[in-house]
Amino acid sequence: MSYAYLFKYIIIGDTGVGKSCLLLQFTDKRFQPVHDLTIGVEFGARMITIDGKQIKLQIWDTAGQESFRSITRSYYRGAAGALLVYDITRRDTFNHLTTWLEDARQHSNSNMVIMLIGNKSDLEARREVKKEEGEAFAREHGLIFMETSAKTAANVEEAFINTAKEIYQKIQDGVFDINNEANGIKIGPQHSPASQSLNVGGSGGNQGGNCC
């Protein structure tokens, strides 16, 4: 299917926070509870609609292990958006956010949109990180913030699409150089001058790989 723009995303965060599960829920609308760890980088894609235009999201799901960190860094450079994920039931994954964020900002373009995601919101009884803490971290570092559940699909659509809306708005504002694909944006065959309103919807797609 043709598209007006292609946006490249990267999903980052510690092992086991649900990065692959979020991607699978967004692209395939299903939850896979039993899964293997992501080895290196896996890939997914889906078409959405913003302002009446087809936008293709090309999403790279990265391994959280330190041994794969150098591979992950190479994918920052071509990304327009990043989903930085922690697990609300594991305090250590929240404590590691600063390291992930520093890594992302060091190796990406300065205009990359970063969405902070507190995943596993369905496990409220096991929560170790308050929602207010996630909100405060996002405010301090200039990030967008949402809590999600890859299991129930709560806010999963919104997380991916709101990130795309921010990227789209930056294009409208002239922040992104859309002729430089190093910014993680590619002009598609459907491209025409864009208007200012943002009406968002989505349609399904497919992705291979397992959940971590």
Curated annotation (Swiss-Prot):
Binding residue positions for GTP: 13-21, 61-65, 119-122, 149-151
* GO cellular component, as recorded: endoplasmic reticulum membrane; endoplasmic reticulum-Golgi intermediate compartment membrane; Golgi membrane
A GO biological-process term: protein transport
Q: Where is the lipid attached (S-geranylgeranyl cysteine)?
A: C211, C212
Molecular-function GO terms, alphabetical: GTP binding; GTPase activity
Q: Where in the cell is it found?
A: Endoplasmic reticulum-Golgi intermediate compartment membrane; Endoplasmic reticulum membrane; Golgi apparatus membrane
A Pfam entry, by short name: Ras
Record's compositionally biased regions (Gly residues):
201-212
Task: Return the SUPFAM superfamilies for the record.
Answer: P-loop containing nucleoside triphosphate hydrolases
Looking at the record's lineage, which domain of life comes first? Answer: Eukaryota
Where is the stretch described as Disordered? 188-212
Q: Which UniProt keywords apply?
A: Endoplasmic reticulum, ER-Golgi transport, Golgi apparatus, GTP-binding, Lipoprotein, Membrane, Nucleotide-binding, Prenylation, Protein transport, Transport
For this protein, the record's Gene3D superfamilies field holds: P-loop containing nucleotide triphosphate hydrolases
Write down the membrane topology. Answer: Lipid-anchor
The role this protein plays is: Required for protein transport from the endoplasmic reticulum to the Golgi complex.
Q: Which PANTHER family match?
A: DRAB11-RELATED (PTHR47979)
Family the UniProt entry places it in: Belongs to the small GTPase superfamily. Rab family.
Name assigned to this protein: Ras-related protein Rab-2
